[in-house]
Amino acid sequence: MGENTVPQKSSDNVGSIVALMVALLVAIFAFQLNASMLSPALVTMQAQLHTTASSIALTQTIFFTAAALFALFLPRLADLIGRKKVLIGMLTLTMIGCLISGFATNVGILMIGRILQGAAGPVVPLCLIILHVKVRDEKRYAKLMAILTSINGGIAGVDALAGGWLVSHGGFRSVFFVMGITAALAILLVSFGTQESTAKDTPKMDWTGVILLVVAMGALLSAVNALQGSFGNLGLPNWLLASILALLGLICFVGFWQVEKRVNHPMVPIHYLKQRRTWGLLITTLLTMTGVFAIMNGIIPALGQDGKFGLGLGADMVSLVTLTPYALAGLFFGPVSGFLAARFGFAKVLRVGLLTTIIGIVLAVAGVLQPSIWLLLLVSTFIGITYAGITNIMLNGLGIVLSPEDNPGYLPGLNAGMFNLGAGLSFIILYAVPTVLHTSVGGSSSGYISGIVTGLILVIIAFFTSFLIPDSKDCKINLE
């Protein structure tokens, strides 16, 4: 018997697994819609709320920051008080946030709503933990886990198109109401389709450690956002504000480390932080996300729209050529990578994903040298398979299967934080390097190339750090 308790009536029959998968899929949909469905509504929100583009952009920043911070501790809290209970609570807060945002009359109320919507941040790792408790066979789990995580990445692009249709027919509020309805449906399905489980040992939550870790990560994420100019209206230079926030984050992390060494039941035992299963995975996730995210969500779309050095496509056409095939390729290949992980192991498939992603990024450089719509489509589809369909799924899966028996929630939470931190760092680093070289992304072909090559170098480093990640069998993982 392992370190998780499951209901006495728990069974692995097909009907219960199908009900569980449907419930978890809709819960993940509810999070994904909050993350990406709003993109086409931003300009309309600015007009209808009589505010500025920077204020609306800040509401997006606040949502993603809140999502990252909730992900740090809610999976561990779920270990202690019940995963089903916490998932329903997260979805309830998300639904309330959607309603507040939908009825918002000014940007201040909208920000409150978006913060509450950020409670959905750890939905994916928590759903993967719930699935792992139910499905004890590692090979079967790998296949089902891949379906959940590929769906999470796969509707990006499609949901944005749906968001655009809703905005044009019902205004931005209709988008929030659809998000709220989806969250309500998820609450209903999770209530009836999942069973409660906790860790075997359920001491009190280490709230001192939680506060210090949340402030530390929040300060670091805010420092990244400050470098991007998200808080420019505070009157301080971006570099100075970022430095202050980074120092605050460092101080709080040192405090977190000291607290965790002294309390009887730490949120994250220090000996786990020192193990390769923790820092090996977190470093690889951070490097990978930093290397890939801005390429696929910034540089490649910008190249498609660039009339001088690229193809001069419209925004809608660029989405159809780059973002949508990238997402759909990940969706369709995800189950295949799950099958491969079940046969060869998560770590080996991760390395294949990273190696082929490196090849895809090299193709992206060719796309700059000889721009064509077919080459951009090929690059987007290829990296959609190798990153969204393989690498991203394996990184999420490793966060679950490498988690220790007595603390299965800490690693998925920290891993989610690295995904979010990497997304922010990606736009800073990949756009800063061309500036150092006296060019810019969009300013010349060499600007695009230097940004992409920077990402390429980071992913190459991630490939080598992936060899630091131990095999799950070496960690004696057993979540039964």
Curated annotation (Swiss-Prot):
Cysteine disulfide links: none
Pfam families: MFS_1
Listed transmembrane segments: 14-34, 55-75, 93-113, 115-135, 147-167, 174-194, 207-227, 239-259, 280-300, 320-340, 358-378, 382-402, 417-437, 449-469
InterPro entries for the chain: MFS, MFS_dom, MFS_trans_sf
Traits of the deletion mutant: Mutant shows slower uptake of uridine. The double mutant uriP-nupA is impaired in uridine transport.
Keyword Repeat: no
GO cellular component terms attached to this protein's record: plasma membrane
Molecular function, one GO term: transmembrane transporter activity
Record bears the keyword Membrane: yes
Membrane topology of this protein: Multi-pass membrane protein
Localization: Cell membrane
Protein keywords: Cell membrane, Membrane, Transmembrane, Transmembrane helix, Transport
SUPFAM superfamilies associated with the record: MFS general substrate transporter
Biological role stated in the UniProt entry: Responsible for the uptake of uridine and deoxyuridine. Not involved in purine nucleoside uptake.
PANTHER family: MAJOR FACILITATOR SUPERFAMILY MULTIDRUG TRANSPORTER MFSC
Family: Belongs to the major facilitator superfamily. EmrB family.
Protein name per the record: Uridine/deoxyuridine transporter
Name of the coding gene: uriP
